[in-house]
Each structure stands twice: as C-alpha cells, then as structure tokens.
C-alpha cells in the first residue's frame, strides 16, 4: 500500500482512572472508519503518573481492548501504557494488528526530571513494525530529545511519537519533531494529550503530522480535543529520498 491513512487522537486523560479513559476512547473509536493506523497518547489509561503502575490494568486486558478496536477499524492501533512486568514497571508502547500480532516497545529514555527512572525500567531494544508496506518506528515522549536512538539506520518510513508533553515546553516539541523528520527523511507524527493533570501540568497538545521535509501535513488546534487525520504517500517519500539521497553520507555507528 503506497498510501497510509493515519489518525492521531489528541485527548484529555482522567488521572489514574483506566476505565474512564477507555470509555472515553471507546466513544471516539466508535465513529472511526477506513483508517490504517490509529494512535493514542502516552500513558493513555492513566496519565503520566509515577505511581501509574500501581493502578495499571493487566497487559492482557489492554491488548484485548486494543485488539477489539483493531478488528473493528481494520487498523493498526496503539499508544503507551504503564504496565507491571515480572522485572518491574514499564512505560510500554503497544501496537496491535487485527490478526492479533503485537509489537511491544518499552520507553528507552525515562524523564528523570519527574523521577520516571526511579519508578520504571528503561527499554533496551528499538523496534520497527511493518504494516501494509510501511515500516513504522514507535517512540515515547522523552525519546524525542535523543536523535541517536532514531538515527542509526534508515529502516523506517514513519516515526510515531506518543507523549504527555507539557505546554511549558511546547516549542521544543514542535522543533524536535520537525528535526527528526528532516534529518531522518521520514514522516513523523506526534500525538500529545491535552488538559491538566493532578501534578499541575498543563498540556496543549500541538499534535502534528509532518512529511520528510518537515512540512505540516495536519495539525491539531492547541488546547482542544481533536481527531487528526492525514494520508501519507510512500511513493512521494521514496521519490524525495532518491532525489535528495543525504543518507548515503551519514556517519555509520552502532548503539552500545
């Protein structure tokens, strides 16, 4: 498939109330049709809380919920959630396909300014999922500030960033998303939440979908709940990469 229909759900989150959040997304997903990828924000069941894992749903329950909507919408669907594992709590990006195939990516870069590294385990493995002819890289919030993690090989066409990124640093969010698109010659989508959390942080969203030149393909109204839709062209992306093959001059390196 050369065209990918992408949807981002920029929404408020109820603090530490997974069932309320799932009911809210149920209402939204009920009306979504004919999309290929649907993305929810970071920690979409709880909000970005350091004790979210104490209130976490079992992973099987979250996967069953995502699978239900993946089948109903015939789309790859996902976002990140706080989960408990035998080794400890993780901030895990789950992407589920209609046939039940699951990709799990654990957030690599934990936000130490909130003490996330004291409550969650850092992911160790970068993941790419192939879906309908597209290669998709899942990333979570603070990962955005570390370009090496998304730069070491040209193995994806679309990077998905899910976040709880406060309004106080909105300029960084917008600038870094564009930088990741330009330097990696890939589509980049950032799905952020809106509203206020119980720690006093305000979120204005600024969810956006960018092409490989850093040009805006779709952008949500700041501070408003929104469904953001765009159609991405793999042929356009490949033509640009061939026309401007900067990756051939990239410095090669390995992640240790």
Curated annotation (Swiss-Prot):
The keyword Disulfide bond does not apply. It catalyses: a monoamide of a dicarboxylate + H2O = a dicarboxylate + NH4(+). InterPro entries: C-N_Hydrolase (IPR003010), C-N_Hydrolase_sf (IPR036526), Omega-amidase_YafV (IPR052737), UPF0012_CS (IPR001110). Transmembrane segments: none annotated. The keyword Metal-binding does not apply. Pfam families: CN_hydrolase. Residues 4-234 form the CN hydrolase domain. Its EC number is 3.5.1.3. Keywords: Hydrolase. It is an enzyme of class 3 (hydrolase). The active site is at 42 (proton acceptor), 107, 141 (nucleophile). GO terms for molecular function: 2-oxoglutaramate amidase activity; omega-amidase activity. Gene3D superfamilies: Carbon-nitrogen hydrolase. Hydrolyzes alpha-ketoglutaramate (a-KGM) to alpha-ketoglutarate (alpha-KG) and ammonia (specific activity 21 umol/min/mg), has very weak activity on L-glutamine, and no activity on deaminated glutathione (dGSH) or glutathione. May function as a metabolite repair enzyme. Belongs to the carbon-nitrogen hydrolase superfamily. NIT1/NIT2 family. This is Omega-amidase YafV. The lineage of its organism: Bacteria, Pseudomonadati, Pseudomonadota, Gammaproteobacteria, Enterobacterales.
């Amino acid at each position: 498939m050369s065209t990918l229909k992408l949807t981002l759900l920029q929404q408020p989150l109820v603090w530490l109330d997974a069932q309320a959040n799932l009911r809210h997304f149920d209402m939204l997903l009920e009306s979504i049709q004919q999309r290929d990828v649907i993305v929810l924000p970071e920690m979409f069941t709880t909000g970005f809380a350091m004790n979210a894992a104490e209130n976490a749903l079992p992973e099987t329950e979250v996967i069953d919920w995502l699978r239900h909507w993946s089948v109903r919408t015939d789309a790859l669907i996902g976002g990140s959630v706080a989960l408990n594992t035998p080794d400890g709590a993780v901030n895990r990006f789950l992407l589920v396909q209609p046939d039940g195939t699951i990709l799990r990516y654990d957030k690599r870069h934990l936000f130490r300014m909130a003490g996330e590294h004291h409550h969650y385990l850092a992911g160790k493995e970068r993941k790419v999922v192939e879906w309908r002819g597209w290669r998709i890289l899942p990333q979570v919030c603070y990962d955005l500030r570390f370009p090496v993690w998304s730069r070491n090989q040209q193995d994806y066409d679309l990077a998905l960033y899910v976040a709880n990124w406060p309004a106080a640093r909105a300029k960084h969010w917008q600038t870094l998303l564009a930088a990741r698109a330009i330097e990696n010659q890939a589509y980049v989508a950032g799905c952020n939440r809106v509203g206020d959390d119980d720690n006093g942080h305000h979120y204005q969203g600024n969810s956006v979908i960018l092409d490989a030149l850093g040009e805006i393909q779709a952008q949500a109204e700041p501070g408003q709940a929104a469904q953001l839709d765009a159609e991405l062209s793999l042929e356009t992306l490949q033509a640009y990469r061939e026309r401007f093959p900067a990756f051939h001059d990239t410095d090669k390196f390995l992640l240790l």
